[in-house]
């Protein structure tokens, strides 16, 4: 019997840039001044992976065109950036949020990030193709992840204990 896979969570938080900034100015600030500092803090608290998905107007127009070609059923997200955290427990993120260095870094965001219309999503990741290869599927073609009941159980997360 193979060991049970540890669930990998993804929490994504979507933001818009401050209206006084161009997309390029926002990207410059995020990549040159913010991300590397944030990455060191996230790593220190056990975050498995951290990244930012930038979605400028050119990308949104492109996905709108794709959506139109596919029948127009998608709702296109209009946010400028989505911050992605991959972790095994929300305790890791809570630890980051309580870190004084991170709190100071968040204070510096105010002139760059709009505080309006922030959207968050939380779920787990099931990867089936990685590095061009099929993964996490056994020889019978069955996924090797635990069942839904195990994966969907968030009751042990500290935020649900309070």
Curated annotation (Swiss-Prot):
Keyword flag Transport: no
| TM ranges | none
* Positions of the EthD domain: 19-113
EC number(s) given by UniProt: 1.-.-.-
Tell me, using the record's free text, what induces this protein.
Expression is positively controlled by the cluster-specific regulator ATEG_00326.
* EC class (word): oxidoreductase
Keywords, in A-Z order? Oxidoreductase
**Gene Ontology molecular functions:** oxidoreductase activity
**What family name appears in the similarity comment?**
Belongs to the tpcK family.
- Functional summary from the UniProt entry: Putative oxygenase; part of the gene cluster that mediates the biosynthesis of isoflavipucine. The PKS part of the PKS-NRPS ATEG_00325 probably assembles a triketide from an acetyl starter and two malonyl-CoA extender units. The poly-beta-keto intermediate would then be fused to the leucine unit by the NRPS part. The resulting amide would be liberated from the PKS-NRPS through reductive release of the linear PKS-NRPS product from the enzyme complex.
Q: What is this protein called?
A: Putative oxygenase ATEG_00329
Q: Which organism is this protein's natural source?
A: Aspergillus terreus (strain NIH 2624 / FGSC A1156)
Q: What is the lineage of its organism?
A: Eukaryota, Fungi, Dikarya, Ascomycota, Pezizomycotina
């Amino acid at each position: 019997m193979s060991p049970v896979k540890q669930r990998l969570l993804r929490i994504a938080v979507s933001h818009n840039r401050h209206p006084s900034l161009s997309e390029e100015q926002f990207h410059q600030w995020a990549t040159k001044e913010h991300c590397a500092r944030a990455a060191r803090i996230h790593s220190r608290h056990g975050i498995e992976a951290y990244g930012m998905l930038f979605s400028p107007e050119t990308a949104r127009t492109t996905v709108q065109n794709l959506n139109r070609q596919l029948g127009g059923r998608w709702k296109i997200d209009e946010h400028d950036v989505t911050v992605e955290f991959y972790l095994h427990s929300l305790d890791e993120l809570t630890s980051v949020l309580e870190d004084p260095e991170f709190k100071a870094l968040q204070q510096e965001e105010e002139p760059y990030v709009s505080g309006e219309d922030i959207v968050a999503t939380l779920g787990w990741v099931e990867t089936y193709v990685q590095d061009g290869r099929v993964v996490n599927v056994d020889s019978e073609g069955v996924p090797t992840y635990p069942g839904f009941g195990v994966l969907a159980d968030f009751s042990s997360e500290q935020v649900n204990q309070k």
